[in-house]
UniProtKB/Swiss-Prot annotation:
Pfam families: PfkB. The keyword Kinase applies. Pathway: Carbohydrate metabolism; D-ribose degradation; D-ribose 5-phosphate from beta-D-ribopyranose: step 2/2. One of its GO terms (cellular component) is cytosol. This is Ribokinase. The active site is at D253 (proton acceptor). Its EC number is 2.7.1.15.
Length: 306
């Protein structure tokens, strides 16, 4: 029987435009290839996990608008349990305004909308879903009070808690003590620990700060350099795959969804990381957020030929 992953997080309608470079203050640029795509860190990670083979339930909020309803239907078609996606009346679905530069880097501005309603009250309504899960995966695009309560419910019921602390913000020691696995990138690790992560040595220092807060496993994603892992007194960098990137928008989300999926299938940590890395590597070779997330079959074939 497949284990259950519950994802708690955001849903955004992504307004994406390609630009030659990011604008400077006071500058106007003409962009190209404008499109509206489905995104939000929570949604991206839920879709990634579902596409890659996980049994996923998604706790989230949408607005009382047509894009929210359309997105909820799309998640159901991905095989995601949408029972816990709440519709907030007289509110818009969250939005993200994304610039993608020629370098393939992206710059994102968020309008929270319905995401700001993912409160303790909404989480409490989904308590039974969290309690019966095998793993809870969260990010930080929704209110911290809801994230903290979900982590408390999970911990009380022996559910593994994975936090992708993005976008980065200072977190309480109480919340950090409830996390089993944390997956920041270099910037997020620095904001949370005060240690600038530039190499393996500094990553070890940052990881020790997380370990001191009670987090057993620290995984710092290093972009093209791979993933730094620290657990059970040992640390190492697991190198990524070399691909021609054209859009990195959902790379981190795809990695998190893939990693947790493989972990729930009883894969070793290294195997789970490689699976997540392979899925993320494929995603950066395509444009868009959820549209770039590969299927399980694509990912397995990529690993076979890597």
């Amino acid at each position: 029987m497949r284990k259950t992953l519950t994802v708690l997080g955001s849903i955004n309608a992504d307004h994406v435009i390609s630009v030659p470079y990011f604008t400077k203050p006071g500058e106007t640029l003409t962009g190209q290839n404008y499109q509206i795509a489905y995104g939000g860190k929570g949604a991206n990670q839920a879709v990634a996990a579902a596409r890659l083979g996980a049994k996923v339930a998604f706790i989230s909020c949408i607005g009382s608008d047509s894009i929210g309803k359309t997105m909820k239907n799309a998640f159901a078609q991905e095989g995601i349990d949408t029972t816990h996606i709440n519709t907030v009346s007289q509110e818009m679905t969250g939005m993200a305004f994304i610039q993608v530069a020629k370098s393939s880097e992206n710059s994102i501005v968020l309008a929270s909308g319905a995401n700001s309603h993912l409160s303790e009250m909404v989480v409490r309504q989904s308590e039974a879903q969290i309690a019966q899960s095998d793993c809870l995966l969260m990010q930080l695009e929704t209110p911290l009070s809801g994230v903290e309560l979900a982590a408390q419910i999970a911990k009380k019921n022996g559910v593994k808690v994975v936090l992708n602390p993005a976008p980065a913000q200072i977190l309480s020691d109480e919340l950090l003590s409830l996390i089993d696995i944390i997956t920041p990138n270099e910037t997020e690790a620095e904001i949370l620990t005060g240690v600038e992560v530039a190499d393996e040595q500094s990553a070890v220092k940052a990881a020790s700060v997380f370990h001191d807060k009670g987090i057993e496993t620290v995984m710092i994603t290093l972009g093209a350099k791979g993933v730094f892992v620290s657990r059970k007194g040992k640390s190492r960098i697991i190198k990524g795959f070399c691909v021609q990137a054209i859009d990195t928008t959902a790379a981190g989300d795809t990695f998190n969804g893939g990693f947790v999926t493989a972990l729930l299938e009883e894969k070793s940590f290294d195997e789970a990381i490689r699976f997540g890395q392979a899925a993320a590597a494929i995603s950066v070779t395509k444009k868009g957020a959820q549209s770039s997330i590969p299927t399980r079959q694509e990912t397995l074939e990529f690993l076979e030929h890597a």
